Swiss-Prot record:
Coiled coil: none annotated. This is SANT and BTB domain regulator of class switch recombination. GO terms for molecular function: identical protein binding. Residues 552-623, 689-715 are annotated as: Disordered.
Length: 715
């Protein structure tokens, strides 16, 4: 075993073997593995393999060869074996995981478990390091002083700070898990911080603000230029009191902070939430942020708070956790507002207290995330998205129309500019109980139990405020209305006739559907929900079907001429044109028959049609419902499709006549209101209905068996 001489060897050359044995004997009870490279660096001239081999020899022998040489060495001022063992365990055998490198603001903190001798060896070349070692002594009840090495790479500066251990742990709780109460252990910890030197100097002055030696020094103050860096550093170091102070400062001086060249993107979600919770939506709206560094983030947190069902928000009485869209009226509603905001006329009900409630139907295809994204694409600002959403979920009551309305519909109060006119019994209207608005020719009932708002024009809703004296500014209702009026250009949505088409507003120049106070026999047992809505919609459907029927009749005689020449020959095309000319007079004759109102002609037509189509209400074309083998395939397919379309048009029209025919017949028979009241009117309707049924049975000459008993008189 060869040993090389080294000038840096602190031990005599003859004692290298003894020093190695002393080190290896102290490692006998240490758990494996052992870093033999670190052991070899302590004793020059030995390789890691030689150290491991010697360690195995000492373990197998069980005795220490340095027992006889230990006392003479100690007499000359050697190192105690216990101190050597603790030094080796702390310097060589501590796990590497004791070193931590984390971000604090714009720098890092590194806590490294290292021996004091090694630190002294590295710092001996600089006067600053030697001065820091002088401060490495204990100071009374606050424990030993800790040296913190701060390195600012951006400014190329280095500085050491000294702080008592107990004060450092109590203020910066981040170090509590790394700094042990054992004095020996604290001397072995080296703290390195990579951040701005001025920020850390501010933090250390804040930590020592209550120290007796700093009574005459001024407490450091927060400024717009340094508060963000101090906030992030203090939050990482777990300085909760300083974090709370920084958050309050940000709340009061946010406009000045965003005007400085600070990076607001380094604020994490936790700090952002705590800052945003201190802002009311009016305070957030007053923040002057030209570059939008932080204002949009505050409103994003405000939007999240609106959707929190457990959060009590002073800015918004309602929350959006139950927001949905009605598939009928297309309004966005919450669970609290769905029974107060009106829907289509057919979706009305009465609760147990006699109040009108509305029954909305949830649209399952609507997604709130897609709605917020589309709203942001439309408004281009999260601030505007918040206010639009705020106006969507909150509602007020109009003192003019006595109806609840959403805040985003504050300009949708419907009214008629002219009062309704109720003519006398001899007028041309169907019933004296029915009036008309001259402004739009819309009919209205004299006694309307629902009292729903109807009108052809809209205006602003009027909200009545409670009388209050000098404390009007502290009234929540006043503040709520003030927020609405100040941002109504963003909150309010334009009035849409499509969404209010069934609320009484006439959408076209055509006369509206006639509805009076006459009761049909089936109304004695209660009218079905949505029946009036069905009547209103069937009128528009009937108009559309009339247009479709006219188009289909014209297409019936032009289908053959649309066939291309490559599929149909010239002779076939000529014969088809001649056939079309023969059909056209039949069409005109058929139209003239429709305008004839003679009863005898109708009887003859009914008897002829009965023999051919078995009392079917639909016209059957004997020539068009057959497959013509002499024609091309395309011609027959087109004819079949047109025939199917014509049938469906006739079926739909017949169903409409079934629904509306009885009502129109009763209206035609009613000339004036009975003097006996509602009961006389009901009796007249029943008699008229029975009389019309008797006449219909007499017109159809069908032999029936003679009844055995006489028919009873209707009651």
């Amino acid at each position: 075993m060869s040993h090389r001489y080294s000038e840096n060897n602190n031990f005599p050359y003859d004692n290298n073997q003894m020093v190695l044995d002393m080190i290896l004997c102290s490692l006998v009870g240490v758990p494996q593995p052992i870093s033999w490279d670190s052991v070899a660096r302590l004793v020059p001239g030995y390789t890691p393999k030689e150290c491991a081999k010697r360690f195995e020899e000492l373990k197998s022998s069980g005795t220490s060869p340095v027992d006889n040489q230990y006392n003479p060495l100690m007499a000359t001022g050697g190192i105690p074996l216990e101190s050597l063992a603790s030094y080796i365990k702390s310097s060589l055998l501590d796990p590497v995981d004791d070193q931590e490198d984390v971000t604090v603001g714009q720098g890092t903190i590194s806590i490294i478990g290292r021996p004091g001798a090694t630190t002294a060896r590295k710092c001996s070349e600089s006067d600053r390091c030697s001065s820091s070692l002088k401060g490495d002594s204990t100071t009374g009840s606050q424990g030993p002083n800790m040296v913190i090495h701060v390195c600012d790479e951006a400014k190329n500066l280095k500085e050491d700070f000294v702080c008592p251990r107990d004060l450092l742990v109590s203020e910066m709780k981040y170090f509590a898990e790394y700094l042990s109460t054992d004095a020996q252990r604290c001397e072995e910890v080296d703290i390195s911080v990579h951040c701005d030197v001025h920020i850390f100097d501010w933090l250390m002055r804040y930590v020592k603000r209550s120290a007796p030696e700093n009574e005459n020094q001024e407490i450091p103050k927060l400024e717009p230029g340094n508060v963000i860096s101090i906030l992030i550093s203090s939050e990482f170091l777990k300085m909760e009191s300083l974090v709370e102070e920084c958050i309050r400062y940000c709340h009061k001086n946010m406009s000045a902070i965003v005007a400085t060249p600070c990076n607001m993107n380094c604020i994490n979600a936790n700090l952002l939430t705590r800052i945003a919770n201190l802002f009311t939506h009016n305070e957030a709206d007053d923040v002057k942020d030209k570059k939008d560094k932080f204002k949009s983030k505050i409103f994003c947190k405000k939007i999240e708070r609106l959707f929190d069902a457990e959060c009590k928000n002073a800015d918004s009485p309602a929350n959006a956790s139950t927001l949905f869209r009605c598939c009928l009226c297309k309004r966005l509603l919450t669970k609290e507002a769905e029974k107060k905001i009106d829907c289509l006329p057919g979706r009305i009900s009465i609760d147990q207290h006699g109040n009108i409630v509305y029954l909305h139907i949830r649209d399952k295809s609507w997604d709130v995330h897609e709605y917020l994204i589309s709203l942001f694409e439309e408004l281009k600002s999260w601030r505007d998205v918040y206010w639009r959403l705020w106006g969507t979920i909150n509602w007020l009551t109009c003192s003019r129309c006595k109806q609840s309305f959403l805040c985003n519909e504050s300009s949708h109060c419907q009214y008629h500019p002219e009062p309704a006119v109720y003519p006398g019994a001899a007028s041309s209207l169907d019933s004296p109980g029915t009036g008309i608005y001259p402004c739009c020719n819309q009919k209205v009932l004299r006694f309307d139990p629902a009292q729903l708002p109807k009108g052809c024009k809209v205006r602003d809703h009027v909200v009545g405020l409670p009388g209050g004296g000098d404390n009007m500014s502290e009234n929540p209702s006043c503040n709520f209305l003030s927020d609405l009026l100040q941002r109504r250009d963003v909150i309010a949505v334009p009035f849409s006739k499509d969404l209010n088409g069934d609320s009484g507003i006439v959408l076209s120049e055509e006369p509206s559907f006639k509805c009076d106070a006459l009761l049909e026999p089936n109304t004695l047992y209660g009218q079905k929900t949505g029946e009036m809505n069905a009547f209103l919609s069937l009128k528009n459907i009937s108009l559309q079907l009339k247009q479709q029927s006219l188009l289909s009749e014209e297409e019936d005689y032009t289908t053959g001429s649309e066939v291309t020449e490559d599929e149909v020959g010239d002779e076939e095309e000529l014969s088809r044109k001649q056939a079309g000319r023969k059909v056209k007079p039949k069409r005109s004759a058929k139209q003239t028959k429709k305008h004839i109102s003679s009863p005898s002609i109708h009887k003859k037509e009914r008897q002829q049609e009965k023999a051919s189509r078995d009392s079917s209400p639909f016209t059957v074309s004997l020539q068009r419902n057959k497959w013509d083998a002499s024609r091309s395939l395309r011609f027959n397919q087109d004819a079949q499709r047109e025939d199917d379309q014509r049938r469906m048009t006739e079926i739909t029209g017949h169903l409409i006549k079934i629904r509306l025919g009885d009502l129109e017949r009763v209206k035609a028979k009613e000339g004036k209101e009975q003097a006996g009241g509602i009961y006389a009117r009901l009796e007249a309707q029943i008699k008229a209905s029975a009389h019309s049924n008797t006449r219909q049975m007499n017109t159809e000459k069908i032999p029936r068996p003679k009844p055995r008993f006489g028919t009873g008189r209707p009651t």
